Amino acid sequence: FIPGKEEDTEENELFKKQVRMLQYMITAHEGFSNKEIIWAINPQYGDGNDANDVGCGRSKSRLPNRLVKKSDGSWAGGYHGTAPTWAAVNRFYTENGLPPAKDPDFYLQSEWLTRYYEGASSPELSKDQLDSEEIKNDIVKFNVGREPRYYAWIAYDGCEYMPLINNNNPLWLNLKNSNTNGYSLSNTRNATGTGFLNKKFIVPNGVYLSSGSTSGDKFRIILIRMAELYLNLAECYAALDRTDEALENLNVIRERAGVRKLTTADLSTMSLMEWVRNERAIELHAEGHRYYDVRRWRIADQVMQPSEFKGLNGMTVNPSFEEFNQIVPIDQPIQWNVRQYLVPIKNSELYSDPQLVQAPGY
């Protein structure tokens, strides 16, 4: 289910297929002839046993905290382990291929956190079972009219998280309900502190069964994939002011993602390097690149300050629609220090060579 794509039209069906393709592009392993992945590893437990089934490791850490109620009355679920910030979800484009704040045809910013389905109201909070499809009434306009990658990799309040994960049924995500997927005083560690979740590396056919078992395709932890190579080329060309070549490589990624191609006219909206960096942040979202990118670009002192880390008001017990949909600072001890641009030299190395000098600030 994608809000705004309810009508049974060819255009909407193609959009949904694009979303599903992007999910499988990240999770399908070499046995499915996935040519996107160049180098990846098969995660293992310490005893050598395979650890990458749908219920383990990297996948489980990203899952919502309650996925299915098991036959014995207990719950199976994940840890809400990775939650994108407000800045991260704002980088993803609208359907028009522009950041939301720069798209004149997108909703006014004053409307972003208002209901898309006008006249609808929040359903009663479920207590003993997961929330029903009615929770889509709480989808806000910010989450409508976005590009395919947004729906493939970002989970938000009211969305259909995955089609089969709840005992072969969809999971409808309610991040306001402390009895299901929301913040709970009895389980304060497993809650999204931003009001969003990552869906990257969640296999679309993954299932948590009421019996307690799981099923679904295995995935690999990606080290290098094709998109990164195109983005690397685009960045190099942009640094050399070779605009045509930079756009050509960027557009390979955008076209596959279902986003319109960039032209030189778009350079009036953002500079070429800003387009390159934003495209990299979207395409490689949650793959471990961003921290190192902002360091080598030397912009970490701008984008890694505590004031930059914001999200929706998800760390509240059973908030109302209005209480939840507020932008608030993330309550985490986040701090950037300029010394982090360089890593320290190990003391053992320093002591072995009197001519070595420690990196500044350590």
Residue ranges of model-derived segments:
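Acidic/polar-rich alpha-helix caps and helix-coil junctions
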Residues: F1-W86, N90-Y362
